[in-house]
Curated annotation (Swiss-Prot):
One of its GO terms (cellular component) is extracellular region. It comes from the Eukaryota. Homodimer; disulfide-linked. Interacts with GFRA2 coreceptor and RET: forms a 2:2:2 ternary complex composed of NRTN ligand, GFRA2 and RET receptor. Also forms a 4:4:4 tetrameric complex composed of 4 copies of NRTN ligand, GFRA2 and RET receptor, which prevents endocytosis of RET. It comes from Homo sapiens. The keyword Signal applies. This is Neurturin.
Amino acid sequence: MQRWKAAALASVLCSSVLSIWMCREGLLLSHRLGPALVPLHRLPRTLDARIARLAQYRALLQGAPDAMELRELTPWAGRPPGPRRRAGPRRRRARARLGARPCGLRELEVRVSELGLGYASDETVLFRYCAGACEAAARVYDLGLRRLRQRRRLRRERVRAQPCCRPTAYEDEVSFLDAHSRYHTVHELSARECACV
């Protein structure tokens, strides 16, 4: 029992000496380096987020040789904040068209049961599909059809006035095990090549 007490006392004493030594070294190091380790000063938060953002832009762009005008970066500077407008359908479509990638092959890792084919399986497969815009493949036919739809001349039939991004070739087969350990093979599940049709 005496040994354990002596070992505990020695351990406490050593750890105290070690922590005092580490603190002293840290203080000496920070004193030697001086203002190099001073933390960066963060701008105080203001009530108006726009003013804070302007101050940040000014600080970033100050002294830059090819800096653009601050007003070009912040078109809302200098005018009072107005009510937010909801984007209309035309605006949403235009924004969607700008960000749309061209027609091409995409892939997604999904569980077989998520495909809705009637198989209960927890296995995952790499599902390749076609997606993207086909505006470059639009023909005169598509332009004419779009105009007739806009003028509501084609009311009853559902017609697409633009080419669609569709698979032109499929993977031969995809195989997986279901929840009952039965082996299944599905043909032409995943796309291999895409084109605007």
